Design a protein with these regions (language model features):
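Non-catalytic structural scaffold of enzyme domains
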Residues: 1-218
């Protein structure tokens, strides 16, 4: 039997190894293909979703469709809102990596803390949760928590330790007053294994996305 193909459109190489490894664990019978364009994130951080971003991403999703992808995942939440436009152009399912996480957070409900280390990701992540709650008829209170600039620590080995320490401490803090803690960026999944027991669920987008892909592909 031919393997199902999952295509991930990435805006950086930072999460490639983690996503490849997690996919191999959770979806061992799937063929994973990565498309990487590291010009997308700087543009989105500076100017939001621009025509240039839409043009490039349109090309990538159409290439993925022509390559017989069974599902396409958008890895970066900073350009996630482009998916709402581009998914109308193709017939293949096109998922924002944080959509399943948003649904799970809303199902848990109540007070939702969303921790991010990039403002261009945090804002659309919060909007996605609010829109998901509206669609599902749920009332939630979303609290954005920006750890500004912390993502830049991931560029060095010593910085990675500091990044993980800062994010973990913030998770513990937000777990005191909220019903669920959401990690806004795929790059933050790395801290899950470092967390000690928390009072509430802590959700990461790669894990919930691959769980959703498994259900979709059957």
């Amino acid at each position: 039997m031919d393997k199902k193909t999952v295509v991930i459109i990435n805006t950086n190489t930072m999460t490639l190894d983690m996503l490849n490894s997690l996919c191999a664990q959770m979806l061992p019978d799937v063929r994973l293909v990565n498309i990487v364009d590291d010009s997308l994130l700087p543009e989105a951080r500076e100017n939001g979703i621009t025509p240039a971003i839409l043009s490039k991403m349109s090309m990538y999703v159409q290439c993925a469709e022509k390559s017989n992808a069974d599902i396409i995942i958008n890895q970066c939440s900073s350009v996630g809102e482009a998916v709402d436009i581009l998914r109308k152009m193709i017939t293949v399912p096109y998922m924002k990596i944080d959509e399943p996480m948003a649904e799970k957070a809303v199902e848990i409900g109540g007070n939702i803390a969303v921790i991010g280390t990039v403002s261009s990701t945090l804002e659309p992540s919060c909007r996605l949760i609010e829109k998901t709650a509206e669609k599902l008829g749920k009332e939630v209170k979303v609290k954005p928590v920006l750890l500004d600039g912390v993502v830049d620590l991931l560029s060095t080995q010593e910085g990675k330790k500091k990044h993980d320490e800062i994010v973990c401490n913030e998770v513990y803090k937000q777990a005191e007053d909220n019903d669920v803690v959401v990690l806004a960026q795929a790059s933050m999944h790395r801290i899950k294994e470092k967390l000690k027991i928390t009072k509430v669920p802590v959700l990461s987008s790669p894990e919930t996305a691959f769980e959703a892909v498994k259900k979709i592909l059957g």
